[in-house]
Regions:
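Exposed beta-strand face motif in extracellular beta-rich ectodomains
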Residues: 58-62, 162-166, 219, 265
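Surface-exposed, flexible coil segments in extracellular/virion-facing regions
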Residues: 34-51, 136-155, 243-261
Length: 265
């Protein structure tokens, strides 16, 4: 057996190769290592070999030749580092229209994960629809989802987990070029951030989560929910306002996320 660590090296990464056998004792055989037909190492029982991978899209052909007792065995290893990018976003996570960041998932959110292979072979790039994708979730292979041109998946967060670990194996149709990428998606609690509108009914985009000092006049507070899993923001979210632990009832037709606070002074 030939053990390559890591199995999917990145560009210029150090790679360790080890030969193992259950039938012969390799410690009593001369093992010669060559890279692209140039000998790099040779010795009795030289089962281990280290090498640095090349740039993305490059290929190194490593041959381990085992000699002894009138027997010659060759093992071929190809190092062809490739890269892939994994992108993710919560589909049903609510954020305000002015929010420019990523939609983060909360409990039981729907999450879309997409893979982008950055393969280069002979100066040609691998097309998204000409690759094979195998998906793993929390170290368990996802069945009936991956395959040819299946470059994205949608999962629902398991509420018993604090994060979702997703791994994708990407290869060309001949399985001669491969890459593996893992991403850990954190699950966060929904949040509420506070804003206010000025006298011209203009909302300040900076939050006032640390408090707001009002010296005169009234202030219109705005509560903005973030990262709630909801299909219909308008109907799925309920608001309950309290001041000093006393429930307030808003006037019919008024915005349920705004509260006019009058300054008695």
């Amino acid at each position: 057996d030939t053990i390559v660590t890591p199995e999917f090296p990145t560009a210029f990464q150090s790679v360790s190769i080890r030969l193992d056998s259950n039938t012969i004792d390799l410690n009593h055989y001369i093992i010669q290592w060559s890279v692209d037909e140039f000998e790099e190492k040779s010795g009795m029982g030289a089962r281990d070999f280290s090498i640095a991978a090349g740039a993305y899209g490059s290929r190194k052909r490593i041959v381990a030749t085992i000699n002894g007792n009138g027997v010659t065995v060759k093992k071929n290893i190809i190092l062809a580092p490739q890269d892939a990018t994994v992108l993710w976003e919560a589909i049903d996570s609510y954020v305000p229209p002015f929010y420019r960041g990523k939609k983060l998932p909360g409990n039981e959110s729907l999450i879309k994960i997409s893979a982008l292979p950055n393969f280069r072979v002979d100066n040609d790039s691998l097309k998204l629809d000409n690759a094979v994708y195998l998906w793993t979730r929390n170290d368990n292979r996802i069945l009936n989802i991956g395959g040819y041109a299946k470059d994205s998946i949608i999962i629902e967060h398991n509420k018993l987990r604090a994060a979702e670990k997703i791994t994708v194996d990407v290869s060309d149709v001949n399985n001669s070029t491969r890459a593996q990428k893992t991403v850990v998606i954190p699950i966060i609690n929904p949040q509420i951030h506070w804003y206010y509108k000025n006298d011209n009914n203009y909302r300040k985009l900076s939050s006032i989560d640390r408090g707001l000092r009002v010296t005169s006049g009234n202030v219109l507070l705005v509560s903005e929910p973030y990262f709630f899993s909801t299909k219909d923001y308008a109907s799925d979210l309920n608001y309950s306002w309290k001041v000093n632990k006393e429930t307030l009832y808003l006037e019919p037709g008024s915005s349920k996320k705004e509260l006019l606070v009058q300054n008695p002074g």
